[in-house]
Amino acid sequence: MNEYLQAVLMILLTIVLYYVSKKIQDKYNNPLLNPALIASIAIIIVLLVCGVSYKGYMKGGTWINHVLNATVVCLAYPLYQNKKKIKKYLTIIFTSVLTGVVLNFVLVFTTLKIFGYSKDTIVTLLPRSITAAVGIEVSQELGGTDTITVLFIITTGLIGSILGSMLLRMGGFKSSIARGLTYGNASHAFGTAKALELDIESGAFSSIGMILTAVISSVLIPVLILLFY
């Protein structure tokens, strides 16, 4: 098959399956029917049935990645709209995100050390709550396995976006600041997309939570590894 045609088909496949998955979620309003999860499973099934390799899919997937990188800039819009509120609560925002990052590191690092996992495994799994673009770089720089890092980043994001609403309701969190920061800190881009579905203010705080988590983590992970190894 012509490479250009295959790329176009893979792009169309992704868009159509995501659109259908989103319609299914809208109809049944079930958090388990996450469109990213359903679309991913559907794409895998189609690729397996049609005998298309990952390399073949990425002929179109690469272009989607380029578009996604550009759409990150759009996250600046809700930040701009809520700049006064963000400035007002900046200390609380930074403290909350820093606490979340540290607790995540302590939990992951301690658990893996107790079970005797190697440095490479620890480095691979520590960036799981960072947005993929930064998490992959951190993992590669410190000797982790980036493909496994990506898997855990996606899994973490999906779990957070699926269970986030339920956990926030159970915890009684109704503030857009609390909801947004929780989504951004725990489940990066997936969580931010979910927060934007709630309201634009939650999306803004999720965006800043995601950004701060990436920045703080990219500084603290190398320091943590340096201290213990």
Swiss-Prot record:
Chief site of localization: membrane
Swiss-Prot/TrEMBL keywords: Cell membrane, Cytolysis, Membrane, Transmembrane, Transmembrane helix
Species the sequence originates in: Staphylococcus epidermidis (strain ATCC 35984 / DSM 28319 / BCRC 17069 / CCUG 31568 / BM 3577 / RP62A)
Membrane topology according to the record: Multi-pass membrane protein
Compartment(s) where it occurs, according to its Swiss-Prot or TrEMBL record: Cell membrane
Domain of life: Bacteria
GO biological process terms on file: killing of cells of another organism
A single Gene Ontology CC term: plasma membrane
Gene: cidB
Role this protein plays: Increases the activity of extracellular murein hydrolases possibly by mediating their export via hole formation. Inhibited by the antiholin-like proteins LrgAB. In an unstressed cell, the LrgAB products probably inhibit the function of the CidAB proteins. When a cell is stressed by the addition of antibiotics or by other factors in the environment, the CidAB proteins possibly oligomerize within the bacterial cell membrane, creating lesions that disrupt the proton motive force, which in turn results in loss of cell viability.
Transmembrane residue ranges: 4-21, 30-52, 62-80, 89-111, 147-169, 204-226
Family of the protein in this entry: Belongs to the CidB/LrgB family. CidB subfamily.
Protein name: Holin-like protein CidB
